[in-house]
Amino acid sequence: AHLFLKLSDNKNTAYFYDLNTKINYKVNENNNLYLSGYFGRDIFSLSESLTNTYGNSTLNLRWNHLFSDKLFSNVSLIYSDYYYGLDLNFIGFNWESGIKNYNIKYDFKYYLSDKMKLNFGTNLTYFDLNPGTINPLDENSSINFKQLDKKYALETGWFAEMEQTLSEKLNFSYGFRLSTFNRLGNSTVNYYANDQAVVYNEDLKIYEKGTPISTKYFGKNKSIADYVNFEPRATLAYEIDENTSVKASYNRMTQYMQLVSNTASPTPLDVWTPSDNYIKPQLADQIAIGYFKNFSKGDYSLEVESYYKKIKNRI
């Protein structure tokens, strides 16, 4: 993209950079520590009037423990930070938004036999969302500082999955994930008549914001709304020969974060928001079938997959 930008008469630039690091430390025969980090940014500048910067930062500390030759575990502490920035120099302000995640994961692998393996564990994620911050670029700007209310949420999950070899050619895996989600305070919540935050105007044929009938302040970490969802999943794989296999699967997925947009297509100012009283979690049921074949001793492969997905509560 940067090569084509050079052909323009304007001073347009586009570039990105990534930094990765990983450190391993063997404590003893049964314990290992792993530390990894990532920092990346994509930057696009249009004729010095607009600069778009976005990227991710992550830090992961993992402890691997071997209980026996059949059972081991991983404990992970994960921090991630998604940043989005837009400098509108021709107007005189900067827009920033982002999501910070603090995640703890504890998972196990237990080899019950040569033909059965059990995976299970739990995780907890705390979300710190900044929907938007408007900063004037200089003291003479006509734009005033504005901080949209930050949003907080807590998601927990428990999962179990059995991987089973039914025969030399047939493998079956099945399990579930049980997730809970809490939208947390520190914010004031509006309440609307008939719980309708958005109403349809029959005369204008458009949706309009509802009129609040009351408000309530929720203190920090107080629960505003909560959800519980059961997510089953199963996969059946059959090996026709050493180079050919077919697979069928079903799984249910829950997404508690939704992308809010004022338009039909994504824009730079779209923001992520957690589920609450009025924005329900997005649920998806998916069925998939696939055909896989290797050629020339694995140098080439053919993969054909088809799926049907039913989505509920999408906004």
Regions of interest found by a model, annotated:
Residues 1, 35-39, 75-81, 120-126, ...:
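Transmembrane beta-barrel strands of outer-membrane/channel proteins
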Residues 1, 30, 40-44, 80-84, ...:
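Structural signature of outer-membrane beta-barrel domains
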Residues 3-9, 36-40, 44-52, 85-93, ...:
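Outer-membrane beta-barrel translocator domains and adjoining extracellular loop/strand segments
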Residues 5-10, 44-50, 58-62, 86-96, ...:
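Extracellular loop and loop/strand-boundary signature of outer-membrane beta-barrel proteins
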Residues 21-25, 61-65, 104-110, 158-164, ...:
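Residues on the lipid-exposed face of transmembrane beta-strands in outer-membrane beta-barrel proteins
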Residues 52-54, 58, 62-66, 105, ...:
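Outer-membrane beta-barrel signature, preferentially recognizing the C-terminal barrel domain
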